[in-house]
Amino acid sequence: MEAVTMAKAINLSLRDALTSDDNVLIFGEDVGALGGVFRITDGLQKAFGEERVFDTPLAESAIIGVAVGLALRGFRPVPEIQFDGFIYPAFEQIVSHVAKYRNRSGVSLPITIRVPFAGNIGAVEHHSESPEAYFAHTAGLKVVTPSTPGDAYALLQAAIEDPDPVIFFEPKARYYLKEEIDPAARVPIGQARVAHEGSGVTVIAYGPTVSVALQAAKAAAAEQISIEVIDLRSLSPLDMDTVMASVRKTHRAVVVHEAPVFCGFGAEVAARISHDAFDLLEAPVARIGGLNVPYPPARYEKLYLPDVDRILQAADTALGYG
């Protein structure tokens, strides 16, 4: 086991995938000689050659269209969409073709689409968005997002090995979090984890908001409030068994994500909890997310993003019922 950043863990996972399977191909904007804008693919083109790690034009729809063609020819493409806000030109290819191909033709498309996403990095417009709900809603796609270096390595391995398309959302603000990883550890798609045990309130988060939820749990403990944090890891398929096991214990739930609350992914989680645990809940399920406005300029993003205080306030409100 060694301590590496999430960025390095993803790089190592890609390197190991390229080594173990000659059909794995990596491509996207600046992923070759430059190694990507975040240097996630640093050194891979030099190690594996331009035929397996290559740059593309600035055309996201074409990037995904090429991935479809390569997958149909027996390859395992791993295209990168450089930033979250650049994925929309590829939306038609992903939703109309990538997601539907297996049901339409019986042919699997083993495509893993890597997408750096979410905010809190002081970026400009189109570089800090949270489009995960669009794709989690789309039948035929698997959607995952790690919050730790170890999960990033293992989930990416699982995604590349999967016979069906996976969108792999990478929380940019977590790229330089450093932790020990075990390359032999396996994390199957569709399995959440208990990131912090507690008994008073369940806080459900994923990707970039897991760290905020853990900070809130630590702050709450100082006030003798016990928060359990669930890291979803996988949005589709969604592991409701782990979520419900926690809610049955705490009888209260708060869902946190960076995307706007209105029609955000948290609405699905909250609806499922409310339906399946109606007789157990001692408070309404709370949702915390970004404001219902386009992602703001960098100087205002701290006002937009969920923070520890908002989570603690929701936990206090939940505990105040009954």
Language-model segment annotations:
Residues 1-165, 169, 303, ...:
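Thiamine diphosphate
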